Amino acid sequence: MDRQFKRTLITTALPYANGPVHIGHLAGVYVPADIYARYLRLRGRDCLLIGGSDEHGVPIALKAKAEGCTPQEVVDRYHELIKRSFEGLGISFDIYSRTTSDIHRRTASEFFKTLYEKGEFVEQTSEQYYDEEAKQFLADRYIIGTCPHCSNDRAYGDQCEACGTSLNATDLIDPRSTISGSAPVLRETKHWYLPLDKHEPFLKEWILDGHKEWKSNVYGQCKSWLDMGLQPRAVSRDLDWGIPVPVEGAEGKVLYVWFDAPIGYISNTKELCPDSWETWWKSEDTRLVHFIGKDNIVFHCIVFPAMLRAEGSFILPDNVPANEFLNLEGDKISTSRNWAVWLHEYLEEFPGKQDVLRYVLTANAPETKDNDFTWRDFQARNNNELVAIFGNFVNRALVLTHKYFDGAVPPKGELTDCDSRTIEEFAAVKQALEHQLDTFHFREALKEAMNLARIGNKYLADTEPWKLAKTDMNRVATILNLSLQITANLAIAFEPFLPFSSAKLMSMLSTDCPFGWDRLGSTDLLPEGHVLGNPELLFEKLEDSVIDAQIQKLQDTKLANEKAAHQAAPIAEDIAFEDFLKLDIRVGTVLECEKVPKADKLLRFRIDDGLSGRTIVSGIAKHYAPEELVGKQVCFIANLPPRKLKGIESEGMILSAEDADGSLRVIMPAAEVAAGSQVK
């Protein structure tokens, strides 16, 4: 950070209020944001940490429909749960509000109207699916159908969750409404678009030239989007849950949630600081920092800055230190499959151990690549680092002081070379910590803080005061004085990371007033004669039985998912026998098979069909290596019209069966038959 700012505004991605918060959210966004905010406050810097719940959009409307309640009831329930969970973990928001608040509705509406009146939107008419039975337009998640890539018949109108392909609703085969189950029809509808292409030259200069210091994963994703060329993006949609578009002729339309949600940062600041919010959002002396996950990079680095620039009076983000994803026990976290460690459950099952989770998530943070959380690693880091290094040193320093000096800080005598080296080592921690925290390297910063405890342990091991107590109490006094100064330094260094443990440590040191960051590295934090509190265990060892219970909990979830997946899908509606006879299903021999360039999921087949041969593209690359299928016989539908996939004309569909775990298995004849044989 070359430029000096007077204040820092820190925002965190708004969690979606249709479910609880899990460890992936925490590791990606909220723990690092809280560490940074606590660090700045400890340094005496003027900063705000802004948070809130994202409460509009299709998933919330769908959840309400499934539960037979209103969307407002859904968001009320989860907003309170999320807010309590954050408080329980010590996420120190200056405000945690919500996008259903009156002030947010007004702020988002005014923002839209400002851009509308300035002519910053373009109006476009497009075709969108409409449910004639329900008499409403269908947003992408209100439509399901068959994925054209992997044949999953439960793909949504925006994405197939089986193969991960992004889709448009019109890509789906046999689309149907999730509301009525009927086949929707295409109807024209008008929407407003933010012309991102208009802002592309500015964004290229601002990001690619002006922010080369951004994290490589953030900069790289932005560059990729800019290199592909930006397209206009709809800011409205046909939906009955959200903030109504505030212009005439927009009945039944609401602000798209991606446009609505980031304005929540502004409205939440207005709610907190009604008289001074503009200082935080419109002053060039304010530094704006967005903490987000990688799925929000484009919105916060390209779309939201384009919105702010179009409005004209707001500052732009100075940094967006986005993290990658955290996996769980080797598998992607999934809320729909309940494959997660939920924060509210953790707080109930591990009372008083908030800092253990904060420590593990920071030590294993997915800062530049996806990382994995395992319960065995959680246990090992607690037992081998927090207990054996940090807690062990603090306990020895305090217990020995109580034993030899009745719990009072002993005088510091003449320093030896060992003392001087130790002082020099722990004094250097401050600068190392500042460098890592200022550049958003929280994992490395935590290592530097823990290094301070390692310095203390080594010092006690080298000096062995328990042996010197028999012959040289003056030397013991100096050793324990320095050990206590290191202990007090640990309370400062760990406050951003482990606030509960730092507060407990301050209590054991009998110090009510917290030390400022500027005193980190000092050797006079605790004056001679200061009486310490009673020593307690700062951390407790986690037994195997505790961890085994958590692993079993996940195993039970996995078994439940497999059981649910094994239930056969409902039988489709009857069709006429004549319609079935129209399908020409044949057996072909695979002559060639290769991956399609720039398409992770697609394989290109050259098939001997007993005639002139044909090319078929199939979305099974994640389930087979190409060489596995060469020479094998497969079943395929031969009379589908050709369809281009990634520029390759596909002349049919290879038939596969989907297993309970989502894997695909190509259907093959039990014994070899002549190429081109029909399936009867």
Swiss-Prot record:
- Residue positions annotated to bind ATP are 335
Map motif 'KMSKS' region onto the chain: 332-336
This enzyme catalyses:
tRNA(Met) + L-methionine + ATP = L-methionyl-tRNA(Met) + AMP + diphosphate
Compartments where located:
Cytoplasm
| All residue ranges annotated as the tRNA-binding domain in the record | 579-680
| Residues involved in Zn(2+) binding | 147, 150, 160, 163
Q: Which residue numbers does the motif 'HIGH' region cover?
A: 15-25
Statement: the UniProt record of this protein carries the keyword Metal-binding: yes
Q: What EC number(s) does its UniProt record assign?
A: 6.1.1.10
Q: How is the cofactor bound?
A: Binds 1 zinc ion per subunit.
Q: In which family does this protein belong, per the annotation?
A: Belongs to the class-I aminoacyl-tRNA synthetase family. MetG type 1 subfamily.
Identify this protein by name. Answer: Methionine--tRNA ligase
Originating species: Porphyromonas gingivalis (strain ATCC BAA-308 / W83)
